[in-house]
Curated annotation (Swiss-Prot):
It is an enzyme of class 4 (lyase). It comes from Bordetella bronchiseptica (strain ATCC BAA-588 / NCTC 13252 / RB50) (Alcaligenes bronchisepticus). Functions in the biosynthesis of branched-chain amino acids. Catalyzes the dehydration of (2R,3R)-2,3-dihydroxy-3-methylpentanoate (2,3-dihydroxy-3-methylvalerate) into 2-oxo-3-methylpentanoate (2-oxo-3-methylvalerate) and of (2R)-2,3-dihydroxy-3-methylbutanoate (2,3-dihydroxyisovalerate) into 2-oxo-3-methylbutanoate (2-oxoisovalerate), the penultimate precursor to L-isoleucine and L-valine, respectively. SUPFAM superfamilies: IlvD/EDD N-terminal domain-like, LeuD/IlvD-like. Mg(2+) binds at residues 83, 125-126, 446. Belongs to the IlvD/Edd family. GO terms for molecular function: 2 iron, 2 sulfur cluster binding; dihydroxy-acid dehydratase activity; magnesium ion binding. It catalyses: (2R)-2,3-dihydroxy-3-methylbutanoate = 3-methyl-2-oxobutanoate + H2O; (2R,3R)-2,3-dihydroxy-3-methylpentanoate = (S)-3-methyl-2-oxopentanoate + H2O. Its EC number is 4.2.1.9. Binds 1 [2Fe-2S] cluster per subunit. This cluster acts as a Lewis acid cofactor. Signal peptide: none annotated. This is Dihydroxy-acid dehydratase 2.
């Protein structure tokens, strides 16, 4: 692919593009710059979340790399919703929706201005899959870079993270921790810029980026404040110029069924966030690959848990970085026969070639597959008469994989949180939160405040929680989410009543309610959906378009080649 055949020439060349060039000159372009390729540098840099506060300097270094490679970097920004400050109130409805908005916004800018390539930076949970979705949708030479996790803090009890603080709220409610100790944790648990430091959603999806080949190997687990991130960002700018000159590899050459399965294996092997089972199918959708929760489940089931990472384990992202990073996990899986080494990486080498010199697992943070922590992955997909489309349970760290108990049904998260805060529930119950799915919420809120309060009260495995909503990557305990079909789509969860006996068996991967088909049919015939407040704005559009969670909760029909990508298309 010649540099003079790039689509930015549609904007910069010819008599009719005189006004376009005038606008570009106003931004600092000169004659030489107008002859070069234009590369978008996008980030979610902002002050609304610590996750994004380290991205600006990294994006600036990517600009240097693009310039060194002979291109013109053009910076722009997009939004980020902080899950940390939107949780446990109506603002969480905006979180998953923001994934689509971010992907759409990046597409609009890159296509609207005919940029030739892209370097994308993200920090908070939904921003990572959003950027990867945009990259695959655009299918231009691109690099995705995660901004990195925060460092852990320290309190009187020792090392603390945001998860400790969230769960400590439940201990204060339960009377087992003084409020002053919680206040001290609040002040110290997040001492630097960066995302949550465990194998929660952000770090899980950063690992997915490496496994898919969209990110440089070894980049994901490095803390945000490490100066080496700046060098990685500059190399990303240089790389994208080489890929532009060579014509690839392009994102849809990297995101294949095999690499998607590799990504699922990495999630399972590390006890990663259940949200990955929502985001990986959405990334696949952008490549035109039908990859559903059933595909995710098959990989999860055959992959051993080999990394001892929080929230189910002991270690943080920094510990994994110091043990060799994501490549150590991938090499252990490759040696164990659990991933495909023939897929391409960002630089065009096969994964097996790129991992050839990777060190062996340290035996603590990461183990060899022969010494796995558990024979199957850290996330289970459950099906049964209560979840025909599937539901997700993070099993990493659980003492028991079976639970049966009567349902206590809540129509939304707030009702359940009130009950948990006032201890208006009993050990042995299954707390059911419904009407929180993608369409019914709308927005599929995370239930971290509820699950953390239960865990803090010492009830993490004494009760179970079931919802058609989502859970945070930081969630631990007997928490089953993403149950489909959701209540708003007429799923069985809508038919539950207080006292119905629910059976959970993560060994057999089943989730059932002890009701006959006839009784379920009678209830369905009599069912009346609860009234929903009128929607407007972004939520109205989202509820009208969103597809089921088992398909990734996507909002468009799937990737097709866009007919206006090259100058010749004019």
């Amino acid at each position: 692919m010649s540099l003079h055949k790039h689509r930015s020439r549609m904007v910069t060349q010819g008599l009719t593009r005189t006004p376009h060039r005038a606008f570009l000159r106003a931004t600092g372009f000169d004659d030489a710059a107008l002859e070069k390729s234009m590369v978008g540098i996008v980030s979610t840099q902002g002050e609304n979340t610590p996750c994004s506060m380290a991205l600006g300097p990294q994006a600036d270094r990517a600009r240097l790399g693009v310039a060194a490679g002979g291109g013109v970097p053009v910076s722009f920004s997009t939004i980020s919703i902080s899950d940390g400050t939107s949780m446990n109130h109506a603002g969480m409805r905006m979180s998953l929706l923001s994934r689509e908005t971010i992907a759409d916004s990046v597409e609009l800018v890159v296509r609207g201005h005919a940029y030739d390539a892209l370097v994308a930076f993200a920090g908070c949970d939904k921003t990572l899959p959003a950027m990867m979705m945009a990259i695959v949708r655009l299918n231009v030479p691109a690099v995705f870079l995660y901004g990195g996790a925060t460092l852990p803090g320290h309190a009187a009890s020792g090392q603390v993270t945001i998860l400790d603080t969230i769960e400590a709220v439940g201990r204060v409610q339960h009377g087992t921790m003084p409020a002053a100790e919680l206040k001290a944790m609040e002040r110290t648990c997040t001492p630097s810029a960066g995302s949550c430091p465990g194998q929660f959603t952000a770090n899980t999806m950063a690992m997915v980026g490496e496994a898919l080949g969209l990110s440089p190997l070894g980049s994901a687990m490095m803390p945000a404040v490490y100066s080496e991130r700046l060098a990685i960002a500059q190399r990303a700018g240089e790389h994208v110029m080489r890929a532009l000159a060579a014509g690839g590899p392009l994102p849809r050459q990297l995101v294949t069924r095999a690499s998607l399965e590799n990504a699922c294996a990495a999630v399972a092997a590390t006890g990663g966030s259940t949200n990955a089972a929502l985001h990986i199918p959405a990334i696949a959708h952008e490549a035109g690959i039908a990859f559903t929760l059933d595909d995710v489940a098959r990989v999860f089931k055959r992959t051993p848990l080999i990394a001892d990472l929080q929230p189910g384990g002991r270690y943080l992202a920094r510990d994994l970085h110091e043990a060799g990073g994501v490549p150590v996990v991938l090499k252990a899986l490759l040696d164990g026969g659990h991933i495909d080494g023939s897929v391409l990486t960002l630089d065009g080498r096969t994964l097996a070639e790129a991992l050839a010199d990777t060190p062996a697992p340290d035996g603590k943070v990461v183990r060899a597959c022969g010494q796995a922590l558990h024979p199957t992955g850290g996330v289970a997909v459950l099906k049964g008469n209560l979840s025909p489309d599937g539901a997700l349970l993070k099993i990493a760290g659980l003492k028991s994989l079976k639970f049966s108990g009567p349902a206590r049904v809540f129509e939304n998260e707030e009702a359940c949180m009130r009950a948990v805060s006032t201890h208006a529930y009993q050990p042995g119950e299954v707390l059911v939160i419904r009407n929180e799915g993608p369409r019914g919420g709308p927005g599929m809120r995370e239930m971290l405040s509820v699950t953390a309060a239960l865990y803090g009260q010492g009830m993490g495995e004494k009760v179970a929680l079931l919802t058609d909503g989502r859970f945070s990557g930081a969630t631990r305990g007997l928490c089953i989410g993403y149950a489909g079909p959701e209540a708003a789509a007429g799923g069985p969860i809508a038919l539950l009543r207080d006292g119905d006996m629910i059976h959970i068996d993560a060994e057999a991967d089943t989730l059932d309610v002890a009701l006959s088909d006839e009784e379920l049919a009678r209830r369905r015939a009599a069912y009346q959906a609860p009234p929903q407040a009128r929607l407007a704005g972004a939520l109205e559009k989202y509820a009208a378009l969103v597809r089921p969670a088992c398909l990734g909760a996507v909002t468009h029909s799937g990737q097709v080649d866009w007919p206006y990508e090259t100058p010749e298309a004019e």
